Amino acid sequence: MNYLLISSKKDPASQNIKRHLENYGYFVHELEKKSNTSKKSDFHDSSLYVFLSKHRSESKKPTLTVHTPGNLTKDNSHGGNPEEICHCNPVFNTLLLQNIDKYNSMEEYQELGFEVSFEVLHHGPTDLNAPSAFVEIGSSEMQWQINDAAEIITNALIDTINAISYGDFEEKEKIIGLGGGHYSPKFTKLALKNEYHVGYLTPKHAKLSENILNQLITKQSFDFVTIDWKGLYGEDKKIYIEFFEKFEIPWKRV
């Protein structure tokens, strides 16, 4: 697999993970700028872009996350282009989340207290020509510096890259998930239970335009769309379902 691991000099968590990967002999492409403000012109062609990153939240809850970058609305204040999402590899995202959870569950890391979850599509970059993912340590400056957190991410990345490179994983149906909160608890649970390979995720509060709906179904391979039935507004469900049925896109409620 032709992949590119990417760090930012402006991101302490990114630098933390980078050091651990380099200790195992992995090359990490380093940016002078923030990762979310990068563009395809900053990188050579690759079949997968993986950004090593910090995660910040007001709760400061220790969290390890995975998500694909993209702007679901015209707001591009955090990088990328308005109403544009990156390509997504649901197998990579799901295996990476599962491997993070595997290492995080080991007895030696229990006292760290990290939660593991997906996040929905958000922020840049958005113009890359291949699947992209952010893997993040959160949610405060204290966690960004924790070596064991970087070691969890590093081991999970190595296992995931090897599994995909050698085809050493179980085939599952690939899905797109609509609805729920920012940390997508329902779809995180489905991924960790190994029920599906989970790709694009969008939150309840996003009002998805036809432009975004078209990108969701063309920039990721999938078997069907899943709708968090209690995690979307009724009006939005109606609009999305009409779109999927118009184009004969299979969907299911969960």
Curated annotation (Swiss-Prot):
InterPro entries: Deacylase_DtdA_archaea (IPR018033), DtdA (IPR007508). Binds 2 Zn(2+) ions per subunit. It catalyses: a D-aminoacyl-tRNA + H2O = a tRNA + a D-alpha-amino acid + H(+); glycyl-tRNA(Ala) + H2O = tRNA(Ala) + glycine + H(+). Its cofactor is Zn(2+). The keyword Amino-acid biosynthesis does not apply. Keywords: Hydrolase, Metal-binding, Zinc. GO terms for molecular function: D-aminoacyl-tRNA deacylase activity; zinc ion binding. Its EC number is 3.1.1.96. It is an enzyme of class 3 (hydrolase). GO terms for biological process: D-amino acid catabolic process. Belongs to the DtdA deacylase family. Monomer. PANTHER family: D-AMINOACYL-TRNA DEACYLASE. NCBIfam families: PRK03995.1-3. D-aminoacyl-tRNA deacylase with broad substrate specificity. By recycling D-aminoacyl-tRNA to D-amino acids and free tRNA molecules, this enzyme counteracts the toxicity associated with the formation of D-aminoacyl-tRNA entities in vivo. This is D-aminoacyl-tRNA deacylase. It comes from Methanococcus vannielii (strain ATCC 35089 / DSM 1224 / JCM 13029 / OCM 148 / SB). The gene is dtdA.
